[in-house]
Amino acid sequence: MHITEIAKVVEQVRKTNPLVHNITNVVVTNFTANGLLALGASPVMAYAKEEVAEMASIAGALVLNMGTLRPDEVEAMLIAGKAANQQHVPVLFDPVGAGATLYRTEVARHIPNEIKLAMIRGNAAEIANVIHEKWEIKGVDAGTGNGDSVAIATKAANKLGTVAVITGKEDIVTDGKRTVIIRNGHPILTKVTGTGCLLTSVMGAFVAVEQDYVKAAVAALTFYGVAAEIAASKTVDQGPGSFQVEFLNQLANVTVSDIEQYGKAEEVR
């Protein structure tokens, strides 16, 4: 998968301005909307069960994020996801904190059983817990533990019949056959709440314009990581507040040539 080919997906997102329907959490809603707008996508946050089916049906992609979990939101996710499936709208799922509590884990396992997913994205612990693999987790952001992340991602892709993405120091994308590792990004991303949730929504924008979901995921991760690296370089010693603002700027400003120059994506099988 050549880096130039990956970079061109960014141009397609900006040219197409895809509508991304987000059922996400209250902590990250504003940041997610601003990030998608900066990228060039069109965000909508619609949660009411009375309208989610209609909204999901006209979207380019549907993103389900269970960060601040409530029963009414779970119901809305299921309604929206099934409507999206009927209209062949790709559905992305971010199982935030799967493994942290029994209820959260039950929901994280139930949604993929009810909805056909185009993609699932989380840290290693979250993805492992979704597919009943042992991996310790502490809180909703814990991704460290003992295990083989590539093996977990591959098992998830095969078991769920989807593209599985595990993010961390290195990002892994696999459909069970093709596996790509992306080595872009910056540690300061972990100091700004919502950067993982925004990433899943950004991936939704890429999936909306690229039917090869492995390529879409790799393109989104590479783009996102390069934007973070450039933003970090421009805000050295200024802290996470300045980084957050500059990161939004870079989501708007990163070019194809930036991705070609700094992108680090390697297909390992």
From Swiss-Prot:
Assigned keywords, A-Z: ATP-binding, Kinase, Magnesium, Metal-binding, Nucleotide-binding, Thiamine biosynthesis, Transferase
Entry's EC annotation: 2.7.1.50
Pfam family, one: HK
Keyword Kinase attributed: yes
Binding site for ATP: R121, T167
Broad enzyme group: transferase
Family: Belongs to the Thz kinase family.
Name the record gives this protein: Hydroxyethylthiazole kinase
Lineage: Bacteria, Bacillati, Bacillota, Bacilli, Bacillales
Gene this chain is encoded by: thiM
